[in-house]
């Protein structure tokens, strides 16, 4: 199985499976001299880790990160400085229960990668989905923690903006609320609605989809490239690589089809400081594949978790018609924990483009 790496200069390779002894990543191309602490990496890991509320999988993983290479420890015993060599990070699996998946060893879960993995490779890891499990994304979040340090002033924040048909009221958007509830929800009025709704979904043994929005501020103007290396192209690609993601939009996205040219165009003026300013940001911070300096805004849609308790029609590896009901511990809405994953992927993509731009133009933005 190939294609386990992404990025060009800031290149991330992830490895490991959902029910293996461990998983991790190798970050290649990180510049020397980047300083960080394990606590800073762990902060982002803790946002993603399972078992933190009744609305996510009850699998209990501490997701403690170990840095194995690519750094030197400072005299304070906490701060690490990158040396420019590959940074390898490891996360141990401690709460896998493979016996829960015995009944689907030869059965394909509808909506899951079971069928296509078996079709392509002739073998699949049915224990939690192997590489197709969202467990793999823990390694991406670890890599994203390093990426955030590469670009000066970069601030990447995400929020859940829709669960099922229930959307937030954008007039109530408050970033301070995002870490105050189990949904990463910026609208405090929507929290009790989602709680009641997801309790019903969870008790029925079903699942539901969601939409995540990520905003990256401090993205240097001018990074990116035209045609085949657009910043928005690579952001879309990175987000689409996340498990269960079925759609991505940048800026106004699909809603721009409803706008006129006058409404959609981001008008400009010169500011009092002699720098250009945009009067709107329908483009989501990117024009012609190149960052404008405005916040980069992306949204991605996540399908409902395929592993559900409701019986569904399928087939087995012998070609028999069967009914499938998945046991085990699963997210009733995988979109909740996708928030820090989306943040990490955009951080890695911006870091990669930042280094590529620096190498091509020599500018330190």
From Swiss-Prot:
Protein residues bound to FMN: 131-133, 243-244, 288, 303-307, 329
Listed cofactors: FMNH2
Chain sites annotated for binding NADP(+): 48, 54
Cellular component GO terms, alphabetical: cytosol
Example of a GO MF term: chorismate synthase activity
Reaction equation(s) it catalyzes: 5-O-(1-carboxyvinyl)-3-phosphoshikimate = chorismate + phosphate
BP GO terms, sorted: amino acid biosynthetic process; aromatic amino acid family biosynthetic process; chorismate biosynthetic process
PANTHER family, A to Z: CHORISMATE SYNTHASE
Role of this protein: This reaction introduces a second double bond into the aromatic ring system.
Family, as annotated: Belongs to the chorismate synthase family.
Description of how the protein assembles with itself and partners: Homotetramer.
This protein's name: Chorismate synthase
């Amino acid at each position: 199985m190939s294609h386990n790496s992404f990025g060009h200069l800031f290149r991330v390779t992830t490895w490991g499976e959902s029910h293996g002894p461990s998983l991790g990543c190798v970050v290649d191309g990180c510049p020397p001299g980047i300083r960080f602490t394990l606590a800073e990496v762990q902060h982002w890991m803790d946002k993603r880790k399972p078992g933190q509320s009744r609305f996510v999988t009850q699998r209990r993983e501490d997701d403690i990160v170990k840095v194995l290479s690519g750094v030197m420890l400072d005299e304070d015993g906490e701060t690490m400085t990158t040396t420019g060599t590959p940074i390898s990070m490891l996360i141990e699996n401690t709460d896998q229960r493979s016996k829960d998946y015995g009944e689907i060893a030869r059965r394909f879960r509808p909506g899951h990668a079971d069928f296509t993995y078996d079709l392509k490779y002739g073998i699949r890891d049915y224990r939690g989905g192997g590489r197709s499990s969202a467990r793999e994304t823990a390694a991406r979040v670890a890599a994203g923690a390093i990426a955030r340090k590469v670009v000066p002033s970069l601030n990447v924040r995400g929020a859940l903006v829709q669960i099922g048909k229930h959307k937030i009221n954008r007039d109530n958007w408050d970033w301070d609320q995002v870490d105050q509830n189990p949904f990463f929800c910026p609208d405090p009025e929507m929290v009790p609605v989602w709680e009641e709704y997801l309790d019903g979904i969870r008790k029925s043994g079903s699942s539901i989809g969601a939409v995540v929005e990520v905003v990256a501020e401090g993205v240097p103007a001018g990074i990116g490239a035209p045609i085949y290396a657009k910043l928005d192209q690579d952001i879309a690609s990175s987000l689409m690589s996340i498990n269960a993601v079925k759609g991505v939009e940048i800026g106004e996205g699909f809603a721009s089809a409803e706008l006129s040219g006058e409404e959609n165009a981001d008008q400009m003026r010169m500011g009092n400081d002699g720098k250009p300013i945009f009067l709107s940001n329908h483009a989501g911070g990117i024009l012609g594949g190149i960052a404008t300096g405005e916040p980069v805004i992306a949204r991605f849609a996540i399908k409902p978790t395929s592993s559900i308790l409701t019986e569904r029609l399928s087939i087995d590896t012998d070609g028999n018609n069967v009914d499938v009901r998945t046991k085990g511990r699963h997210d009733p809405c995988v979109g909740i924990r996708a928030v820090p994953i989306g943040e990490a992927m955009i951080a890695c993509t911006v870091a990669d483009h930042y280094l590529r731009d620096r190498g091509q133009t020599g500018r330190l933005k």
